[in-house]
Structures are given as structure tokens and as C-alpha cells.
Curated annotation (Swiss-Prot):
One of its GO terms (biological process) is monoatomic ion transport. Glycans are attached at residues 24, 274. Pfam families: Sugar_tr (PF00083). This is Solute carrier family 22 member 23. The keyword Transmembrane applies. Its main location: membrane. Residues 165-177 have a biased composition (Polar residues). The chain crosses the membrane at residues 229-249, 253-273, 283-303, 310-330, 339-359, 466-486, 489-509, 541-561, 572-592, 601-621. It is found in: Membrane. Residues 1-55, 162-188 are annotated as: Disordered. InterPro entries: MFS_sugar_transport-like, MFS_trans_sf, Sugar_transporter_CS. It comes from Mus musculus (Mouse). Belongs to the major facilitator (TC 2.A.1) superfamily. Organic cation transporter (TC 2.A.1.19) family. Gene3D superfamilies: MFS general substrate transporter like domains. The lineage of its organism: Eukaryota, Metazoa, Chordata, Craniata, Vertebrata.
Length: 689
């Protein structure tokens, strides 16, 4: 009966419209064939592809010539990793290697900029000018013994004052602050900040920084946190906006304009006349820096074949860490914060040459069907790599010639909302990134909170290099884990380690402390005797180190994972979302410092709960190791979720694979060809009387 009603509604089928073009990731039946193979493994067969039924024309025959222009482009051109990249020589082509190296060099400058807050905005020890070093007068904010500038120490029994908790709210950077007591009440402490001028003991190798330049102490301490806040907010907005623009106009223009404007705003920061101007310009500097980070990351991914993507991305991370390790020496060389800021920004001048050296992403041109520009770039690359036309075994160039009349087809990141699987994958990775970078600050603050009891952590350089060394060890471990477990397995392992470290630090140590104070049994008495405060502090530091180690890997791997599973047409937009989520995680540090560490414990508990949710959600992600990058939204939808452990021989999987899925997209065309069906025919066979 349903077939009869369709037949009546459709009439003779002459007025039926062809299937709609691709929208929000859905393809017409005839276009699905062009997208299915790209989700498979590189170099493998098409055993896991969805095999769609051929599309039927309303008259029962093939599509007419008037519909040919709206059909999908050639499958050969969409298979970039399998056809186009091998034709250009892959990563073995000399010009491609040069381009990859050119994406590594700016990572050093980016590392300088990302960690500059630790030096420009470090809050030094200070005392009233004219009070004498180590002398406590009216308004003196810090008491202690002064040797030389690098050896300032404070007696551990010194009570906190309004100024002292204001000046020590950040010992090295926004993520390694010691625990601070609640602000003391008014009264005698009101006289501690009656000074109008101070002398400073800056620990970062500089003679003057932003805090000492404009006396951002006592009642003005909050302006330091706003300055840190402004850079991160600029990064967040930059990731979101430049990501969408890069998907629409291309990676190359965004990279060029971001470089030009970071030179303008970055150098103007060094000429700031007050802290308000400094914070405002830092926002725009962060905005432009985000455009550079995002476009270079996408270009690096799109240049590489499947087997080289991860290692090339990790090399860029190591170069950025080199900038982190070199920053203290650079600060000691400059001695003044304005010179340091100018020296950090000036190397970006070299990136102006990229306009004439670095071409547009060929993968993006092919994915957005800009075949005219793609043809010119392919000819240019073959000339640079000395590739002869005879090596085009698969016939890429002849197919490209046939498609030159196509109009470009660009996509915005909002299209992902209508997809079935892709938006879920991106949301999961955004939450992972937010959790990883957010809880990293909790572990760092917990570790630096024991600096009074661990003399090594009292030194600024010890704090700084401890954090940098943990990040370096995390990246090294990530290389090994991802090699053996893949992207999804590695992310799951590091998230489990993060959750364990967080829960043990929050629960186990508090439980031990409770039992040690009220021993009700012989076992508890032994715990009370054996578990001293120093031992608990050592456990807490150990858990903090493990937590920072694992959470750094979670954040970095989430960003890389998103770059692989997001289709080329919206890759920068997807990267912008996950990087902005990471920025929100890092933003919690200056926000909590701005409120004098209030709500820190709740902050840690919330992120600890998020780690448990993320462990479950990671299992929903596909595995992208050794797979071709998806080129359009339909390719991203074809990424399958495979089990973590391979099936044993003879064991049947419980879930259907892509090869076993059936395509019912042509059923609605049965009514259109109903005139050719015998009487009594149904969708499932012949109707018996």
C-alpha cells in the first residue's frame, strides 16, 4: 500500500527533482562512491568501503547530461593521499621537505611568545624604597635576608600580609602558583601598602619588567592577572575566527596577514605607556599569534603522507619547547622587558618571505574544487621536484583537465552541526583538550605549593625548568605510546593516568591525613606513625608530576587527533574549536589567581570528574593512524570506530563493518520507476495472494 501511495503521489515521475546536492555531510547516492574509499587505510584495498547502489534517474535510465555538472568530481582527484600526493613524489619530493622545514622554523618564535608571560609579568619580591634591604619599616612588604639579586630568601615563619600574598600570587607563570592563605582582615595590615615607591628583586634575569615598570603591587596586583588574561582571551578569539577564515579564503592569506599584524601589535606592546595599553595590545598580539599557530599546524598536517603526520607534528612541538628552554637565556641577555618583547617579535619578519616561498595548500584547493588553481600548483610542484609527466600512472592530470569548469565549493565549520558522527568526535576532543589543559594548572599549583618545604622549588629557574622538563618528557613518551597504541589508545592511556593522579591526590592523601589524626585501630595507628607530613608532601609532589606529565599529553594529542579526523574543507575551523577549548582550560589559572585562589579545590574536583567522563567518551572516537585524511564532510562521516583490540581468528564482530552495511538510499526511487514493475511487486519481493 505504501508503494501505491508513493506511486500516486509521484505520478508518472516526470516532475520529480534530482537528489539534492551535498548538504551538511549527506551525499546523493551517486556521490557516495566518491567519498567512501578515502576513509580507508592508506595503501589498502576497499574492503571497508560502503558500496552504494547506482542512482536511478526518474525515467529509469542513467542521469541525463544536464545533471552531469552537479555530479561529484572524479574519485581520483578526491583521493589526494592515494593519487595526487604519490604523483608529486610524496614527502620524498625535495620541495615538500623544504615546505615542512619552513613550518618548523616559526615554532621557535611561537615558543618565545607563548612563554613570555613568565618573564614579562613575573611578580617579584618588593620592599619600600629607602627602607633598606632586609629592613621592615612601615609599608615594607617582604622581610628577609638580601644577598645578591638571585638569592633572595624569606623566613618561613614570616606572617602573610596584604602585600605579601599579593606579590607571591605567581612565582613563575600563570600555572605554577603556590597556595596562598585567605586574605587577612583589615587593621594593622592596612599600613603595609602605604608606600608610594618600591624597590624590586626580580628573579627572571631582567632589571625591569612590567610589574616593576608600573608598580603593579598591593592594590594594583589584579592588573597583572588581567594582562595574563588578555593574551589568552586573544588566543581564544583568534583560534575561532582565523580558523573559519582560513577555511574560506585559504591558509596562505591568513598566515600572511597574521604575520603582518603580529609585527605591528607586538612591537607596539614594547612601546606601551601604561598597563591598560599593554593589556589591550597583548589581546591583539594573541589574536594574531593564534592565526599563525593554527595555519602552520594545518599546513603541516596537509603536506604529509599518513605515516609521517605524527612525527612531523612532534618535531614542531620539540622546536617550540626549545624556545621555552632558551627563554631564560634570552631574558638574561636583554635585561629589559621592552627589549625582550621586541626581540621576541622581530624574528617574525622572516615569515614575510613566506608569501613568495610558501604556496597555498594543494590539498585544500583540491578539496574545495578549485581545480584551476590546483592545476597551476601541481605543474609548479612537478617542476620543482623534477617529476616527469610520464610518472602520472593513474592519470591525475587528464582527470584534472576534465574538471576545470567546476565552480569552487567552500564549506564553513557550522555545516558540521548537521552531521551524524563528525560533530560528536569534535565535541569529545574539545572536552578532552579543555580538561587536559585545565587540570594541568591544578597539578602545577599543587606541586609548587610545597616549595616552602622543598628548597629546590624556591628558585624561579628550578620552577621553570621543572615544568619544561615535564612537558619534554611527556612529548617523548607520547611518541612511543602512539606508535604502539595508536591515537585513540594513547589518548585513553594518558587520560586514565591523569584521572588516577587527580583522584589519588584529592582522595587518598586526605583520607590518610584523616586517619592519622584519629587512629581507631592498630593499622591506623601504624599509618599515623609512618605517614608524616613530609611523606604526604612527597606523595603529593609525585602525583602532581604524574598528573602534569599525563595531562600535557592529553591536551597535545587531542589537538593532533582533531586535525586528523576533521575534513580538509573545515580542518582549520575544527582545529580552532579544539585549540580554543585548550585556551579556556588555561584561562582558569589567571581567573583563580584574580580571585586570590578562591574556589581552587572545587576547580580541581570539577576537572577530576571531567577526566572520568572523557575516559568513556574516548572509546567513541575512530582510529586515524595510517588512514588517509578526510577531504570533505562525507569522508569524515565514514571514519569507523574500530575496537581497541583486534578480533581473534574465527571470531565474528558484534557490530557491522562498513563493508557489511546496506545502502537503502535508492528505495525512494522505486515509486518513480513503478510503471516498469510487474503487478503485485513490493519492496521485498512479489506479493502473494
Amino acid at each position: 500500500m505504501a508503494i501505491d501511495r508513493r506511486r500516486e503521489a509521484a505520478g508518472s515521475g516526470a516532475g520529480r527533482q534530482p537528489a539534492p546536492a551535498e548538504e551538511n555531510g549527506s551525499l546523493p547516492p551517486g556521490d557516495a562512491a566518491a567519498s567512501a574509499p578515502l576513509g580507508g587505510r592508506a595503501g589498502s584495498g576497499s574492503s571497508a568501503e560502503i558500496q552504494p547502489l547506482p542512482a536511478l534517474h526518474p525515467s529509469g535510465g542513467p542521469h541525463s547530461s544536464c545533471c552531469a555538472a552537479t555530479a561529484a568530481p572524479s574519485l581520483l582527484l578526491l583521493d589526494y593521499d592515494g593519487s595526487v600526493l604519490p604523483f608529486l613524489g610524496g614527502l620524498g619530493g625535495g620541495y615538500q621537505k623544504t615546505l615542512v622545514v619552513l613550518t618548523w622554523i616559526p615554532a621557535l618564535f611561537i615558543g618565545f611568545s607563548q612563554f613570555s608571560d613568565s618573564f614579562l609579568l613575573d611578580q617579584p619580591d618588593f620592599w619600600c624604597r629607602g627602607a633598606g634591604k632586609g629592613t621592615e619599616l612601615a609599608g615594607a612588604t617582604v622581610t628577609g635576608r638580601w644577598g645578591d639579586m638571585g638569592n633572595w630568601t624569606s623566613p618561613s615563619a614570616t606572617p602573610f600580609s596584604t602585600a605579601s600574598w599579593g606579590t607571591t600570587s605567581n612565582r613563575s607563570n600563570s600555572s605554577d602558583t603556590p597556595p596562598l592563605p585567605s586574605p587577612p582582615g583589615k587593621g594593622n595590615n592596612d599600613s603595609n601598602c602605604d608606600c608610594h615607591a618600591w624597590d624590586y628583586g626580580i628573579r627572571t634575569g631582567l632589571i625591569q619588567n612590567v610589574v616593576s615598570k608600573w608598580d603593579l603591587v598591593c592594590d594594583n596586583t589584579w592588573k597583572v592577572h588581567i594582562a595574563k588574561f588578555s593574551l589568552l582571551v586573544g588566543l581564544i578569539f583568534g583560534y575561532l575566527i582565523t580558523g573559519c577564515i582560513a577555511d574560506w579564503v585559504g591558509r596562505r592569506p591568513v598566515l600572511l596577514f597574521s604575520t603582518i599584524f603580529i609585527l605591528i601589535f607586538g612591537l607596539t606592546v614594547a612601546l606601551s605607556v601604561n598597563v591598560t595599553m599593554f593589556s589591550t595590545l597583548r589581546f591583539f598580539e594573541g589574536f594574531c599569534l593564534a592565526g599563525i599557530i593554527l595555519t602552520l599546524y594545518a599546513l603541516r598536517i596537509e603536506l604529509c603522507p599518513p605515516g609521517k603526520r605524527f612525527i612531523i607534528t612532534m618535531v614542531a612541538s620539540f622546536v617550540a619547547m626549545a624556545g621555552q628552554f632558551l627563554m631564560p637565556g634570552l631574558a638574561a641577555l636583554c635585561r629589559d622587558w621592552q627589549v625582550l618583547q621586541a626581540l621576541i617579535i622581530c624574528p617574525f619578519l622572516l615569515m614575510l618571505l613566506y608569501w613568495s616561498i610558501f604556496p597555498e595548500s594543494l590539498r585544500w584547493l583540491m578539496a574545495t574544487q578549485q581545480f584551476e588553481s590546483a592545476k597551476k600548483l601541481i605543474l609548479y610542484l612537478t617542476q620543482k621536484n623534477c617529476v616527469s609527466p610520464e610518472s602520472d600512472i593513474k592519470g591525475v592530470m587528464p582527470e584534472l583537465e576534465k574538471e576545470l569548469s567546476r565552480r569552487p565549493k567552500k564549506v564553513c565549520i557550522v555545516k558540521v552541526v548537521g552531521t551524524r558522527n563528525l560533530w560528536k568526535n569534535i565535541v569529545v576532543l574539545c572536552v578532552n583538550s579543555l580538561t587536559g589543559y585545565g587540570i594541568h594548572h591544578c597539578f602545577a599549583r599543587s606541586m609548587m605549593g610545597h616549595e616552602v618545604k622543598v628548597p629546590l622549588l624556591e628558585n624561579f629557574y628550578a620552577d621553570y625548568y621543572t615544568m619544561a622538563s615535564i612537558a619534554l618528557a611527556s612529548c617523548l613518551a607520547m611518541c612511543l605510546v602512539v606508535k604502539f597504541l595508536g591515537r585513540r589508545g594513547g589518548l585513553l592511556l594518558f587520560m586514565i593516568l591523569t584521572a588516577l593522579a587527580s583522584l589519588l591526590q584529592l582522595g587518598l592523601l586526605n583520607l590518610i591525613g584523616k586517619y592519622s589524626q584519629h587512629p581507631d585501630s592498630e593499622l591506623q595507628l601504624k599509618l599515623a606513625v609512618g605517614m608524616s607530613d613530609s611523606v604526604k608532601d612527597k606523595f603529593s609532589i609525585a602525583f602532581s608530576i604524574v598528573g602534569m606529565f599525563a595531562s600535557h599529553a592529553v591536551g597535545s594529542l587531542s589537538v593532533f587527533f582533531c586535525a586528523e579526523i576533521t575534513p580538509t574543507v573545515i580542518r582549520c575551523g575544527g582545529l580552532g574549536l579544539v585549540l580554543a577549548s585548550a585556551g579556556f582550560g588555561m584561562l582558569t589559572a589567571p581567573i583563580i589567581e584574580l580571585h586570590n585562589q578562591k574556589g581552587y579545590f572545587l576547580h580541581h574536583i570539577i576537572f577530576a570528574c571531567c577526566t572520568l567522563i572523557c575516559i568513556i567518551c574516548i572509546l567513541l572516537l575512530p582510529e586515524s593512524r595510517n588512514q588517509n585524511l578526510p577531504e570533505n564532510i562525507a569522508n569524515g562521516e565514514h571514519y569507523t570506530r574500530q575496537p581497541l583490540l583486534p578480533h581473534k581468528k574465527g571470531e565474528q564482530p558484534l557490530l557491522l563493518t562498513n563493508a557489511e552495511l546496506k545502502d537503502y538510499s535508492g528505495l525512494h526511487d522505486v515509486a518513480a520507476v513503478g510503471d516498469g514493475l510487474p503487478e503485485g511487486a513490493t519492496a521485498n519481493g512479489m506479493k502473494t495472494m
